[in-house]
Amino acid sequence: MEKFTKLTGVAAPMPVVNIDTDMIIPKDYLKTIKRTGLGKGLFAESRYLEDGSPNPDFVLNKPAYQNAQILVAGDNFGCGSSREHAPWALLDFGIRCVISTSFADIFYNNCFKNGILPVVVSPENLEKLLDDASRGSNAVLSIDLERQEISGPDGGTITFEIDEFKRHCMLNGLDDIGLTLEHAGAIDTFEKANASVRPWA
């Protein structure tokens, strides 16, 4: 998993509450277990018109936001079913950070496992960040995970809280496999000791 230390990128405003995983990645794209290639299905029902052409009114289709790496979204982002395809689609599109006032628990945890940083801010700070993100290609935010700060285009900063263990995993690029490998030496020592006292096991 790619490390997340500091990200500076265009932030796209999506001030919609209760964006669920069905909206993030429709069921038609769930037939694969590959993590790549799902970016084309991200927000597909809103992003494309009936004829399959891009919807010019959808935020991620607008020239200023086509390379967005940050989403600033409404409350309760990622609610609905627990499909892990949702963070896969966000990551494949290029989104590395989602900022909201709250997230559905399963989606929130799945983000950390897939290298996406979900940041919780107050309603007041979300409004400020949405205003920043509405500046088009000038809507550049910097997310500093080490300092736990968001810097806006005007130079102002917003601090955020994050679980220390999750922060450690993101800073070091550790998914479940990476965490296991961190303790490979201890696991090997235990297995050798266990084999000597329980050779039948």
From Swiss-Prot:
Q: Which GO terms describe its cellular component?
A: 3-isopropylmalate dehydratase complex
Identify the InterPro entries for this entry: 3-IsopropMal_deHydase_ssu, Aconitase/3IPM_dehydase_swvl, AconitaseA/IPMdHydase_ssu_swvl, IPMI_Swivel, LeuD
The organism's superkingdom is given as Bacteria
Spell out the Gene3D superfamilies in the cross-references: Aconitase, domain 4 (3.20.19.10)
Matching Pfam families = Aconitase_C (PF00694)
Q: GO annotations under biological process?
A: L-leucine biosynthetic process
The pathway that the record names for this protein is:
Amino-acid biosynthesis; L-leucine biosynthesis; L-leucine from 3-methyl-2-oxobutanoate: step 2/4
**Catalyses which reaction(s):** (2R,3S)-3-isopropylmalate = (2S)-2-isopropylmalate
Q: List the keywords (alphabetical).
A: Amino-acid biosynthesis, Branched-chain amino acid biosynthesis, Leucine biosynthesis, Lyase
What is this enzyme's EC? 4.2.1.33
Gene Ontology MF, one:
3-isopropylmalate dehydratase activity
User: Can the keyword Lyase be found in this entry's annotation?
Assistant: yes
According to the record's subunit comment, the protein's assembly and interactions are:
Heterodimer of LeuC and LeuD.
NCBIfam families in the record, alphabetically?
leuD (TIGR00171), PRK01641.1 (NF002458)
Query: What role does this protein play?
Result: Catalyzes the isomerization between 2-isopropylmalate and 3-isopropylmalate, via the formation of 2-isopropylmaleate.
Recorded protein name is: 3-isopropylmalate dehydratase small subunit
Could you read off the lineage of the organism from its UniProt record? Answer: Bacteria, Pseudomonadati, Pseudomonadota, Alphaproteobacteria, Hyphomicrobiales
**Designated gene of the protein:** leuD
